[in-house]
Amino acid sequence: MYVSGVTFACSIPVTRSLKQNYGANKMEQNPELEQTENVIEEHQLTDGVISVVLTADNHLGYNASSQPPRKRELRKQQLRHAFQQATDFAIDQGVDFFMQAGDLFDTTNPDEQDRSFVAERLAQLRQAGIRTLAIGGIHDTSIDTPTALDGAKVDFTFSTPSPQLSYARLGALHYFTQSSDLSKAPNPAQAQENKYLEPVVFDIRGTQVGVIGLSVVAGQEGDPLEYLPSRSDLDRVTISLLLLHAPIEGFTTDSSLDDIRAQVNQSSIANQSLFRYILAGYHHAYQHVSIGQCDLIVAGATQHIEYSDPDDEPGFVFLGLAADGIRWCEHITVESLQLRRLVVPVRQLMPQNTNTDHTDITDNILERLRPLCTEDAMVQLRLEGELTREHYHQIDLNKIRRYGEKHCFALSIDDSAVSFLSEQEIVASSNGYGSPVHREERFSPREELMALADEWIAAAPDEQERKALQATKEELLAALRHM
């Protein structure tokens, strides 16, 4: 596909002042931005240099069901605001391309408010003469049942169209789709052939720029770069780009999705000669590395989404690209929630004084938690180590949760690393802690619930209450199975 360049009907330079548009205070806080501005001013009128704003993993519509409605709505507003900071920056700088590398939405069926919001931002980009390119991600691309190809390969048929397709049909962006996004291939041979994606080529002030978009879906296996052609229309372009959404070997991945088995191998990147640049999403931390003759830039997320996210500041990337290398590559941070973590070894909570009650243990945790809790903080409290059930039940988790709800934006309590010691397996030691002599029992919410429920049922004063407690136990266990 070939798309002619857009002629700007105005005299403003392609790249305005970062200090003017990004703020003098921010420039003073980050000297690298001022250095970047000098580089941009040097190259902004040079033929052969294209400017790009790259963003990914915006996760619009993300819904933390554990939070109250007011905070859920505020969270959605924060996600939209972060994405708008990227589009506003692109418009202010008058860039050539705005590229979105997957997971624009957190769902395949975003609500009308998020859809309308994105439509407005895309309209503004188009009005500014900026070309917008996008690919789907793991969260905003749905799949149906896979069908076998050639006895080994798998092709995925999409049950519902990706939400970005509606914008593409209106001409607001170019959306790279797999063939199965639009229709089922009539036979396996054609389906296999259609896996090789067609590049789109742009003319930017006389410079030919070719782009291919590629993303993985849940259940896909292998290295997605194997589906790229060895030769294509990219052979005749000056600058070749791959817009990618996939796990990359060697990059930290802590996805909540268990069905991600595809991975781009670094050797595949090093051995390919088709792309000078790979602009990627999926990983939530910004990265810029050189692999072979290729520059790999990972945009990172525009907000912290999960507590497993890296500590890096969220943002987007501002790029100046040429055939012979990068002219500038700047990660621009956005306003975001702060991600903070507190690890508490539970052995430190086990009282040496037998008169110590649960209030002292809980207050001990709150005292450690207090400095981290602010209105703009996502805080994870992680309990680790070995303790008895008795000591565990002396921790008032509800009180800690209520404190978190009041003093920080969100609080998560992770006790998956707690191990229970049975009373029979504890031998009193001189320091009063006790030590395990045989085995440790891993904490399980389901088993803990069953044990507590059985205690209550056994202590029930009559048969009617025992039956009621038994029914409640079964309902809770059923709910746990679906969590």
Where are these regions (language model features)?
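Extreme N-terminal basic, low-complexity initiation segments
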Residues: Y2-T7
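N-terminal active-site segment of His-dependent metallophosphoesterases
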Residues: Y22-S116, R121, Q127, K473-L477, ...
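Accessory, non-catalytic peripheral segments of nucleic-acid enzymes
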Residues: E28-V39, T46, G325-M483
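Structural beta-sheet core signal
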Residues: L54, Q100, A134, L242, ...
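Glycine-rich phosphate-binding loop signature in dinucleotide/nucleotide-binding domains
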Residues: D92-G94, L234-R236, L372-T374
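His/Asp/Glu-rich metal-coordinating catalytic cores
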Residues: F97, T108-A123, A128-Y307, D311-E313, ...
